[in-house]
């Protein structure tokens, strides 16, 4: 039997084997956009995040940089910062990652990212 628990009430579940199971798409969009919910839950978080070619820590760093470079600093960005912390990215590492990415994606985007990162890592 596989034990699965809900993580942070965001529809993300992790089994004892650290397999990510996402339900946020179905939970929030359900019948309204079932195809999008499928891609979100089963493909993006199911297949992509569970692909073992890249470890979760590295995957989290890549995701934080990708979202930062788009200027996306909403609740989903904060959620991915929280995941990065849970996946072993230290405060020193996230600060270095955001600083490095600032030169490529823009200083204002880094400032916005730092505001949320500071909130996540100081809690």
What annotation goes with each model-predicted range?
Residues 2-58, 78, 82, 86, ...:
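Acidic, glycine/proline-rich low-complexity segments that act as flexible tails and inter-domain linkers
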Residues 59-67, 97-98:
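Short, structured motif recognition centered on aromatic/hydrophobic residues
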Residues 89, 93:
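Winged helix-turn-helix DNA-binding recognition segment
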Residues 73-76, 107:
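Short loop/beta submotifs within extracellular cysteine-rich repeat domains
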Residues 46-47, 65-69, 101-104:
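Alpha-helix C-capping/helix-to-loop hinge sites
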Residues 77, 94:
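Aromatic/hydrophobic pocket-lining residues that form the small-molecule binding cavity
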Residues 70-71, 86:
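Short, solvent-exposed interaction modules
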Residues 95-114:
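C-terminal structural segments of small proteins and small subunits
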């Amino acid at each position: 039997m596989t034990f699965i628990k809900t993580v942070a009430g965001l529809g993300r579940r992790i089994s004892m084997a650290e397999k990510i199971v996402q339900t946020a798409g179905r939970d929030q969009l359900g019948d309204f956009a079932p195809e999008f919910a499928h891609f979100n839950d089963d493909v993006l978080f199911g297949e992509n995040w569970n692909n073992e070619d890249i470890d979760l820590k590295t995957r989290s760093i890549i995701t934080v940089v990708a979202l930062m470079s788009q200027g996306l600093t909403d609740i989903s960005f904060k959620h991915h910062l929280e995941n990065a912390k849970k996946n072993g990215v230290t405060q020193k590492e996230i600060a270095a990652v955001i600083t490095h990415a600032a030169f490529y994606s823009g200083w204002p985007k880094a400032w916005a990212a730092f505001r949320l990162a500071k909130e996540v890592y100081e809690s």
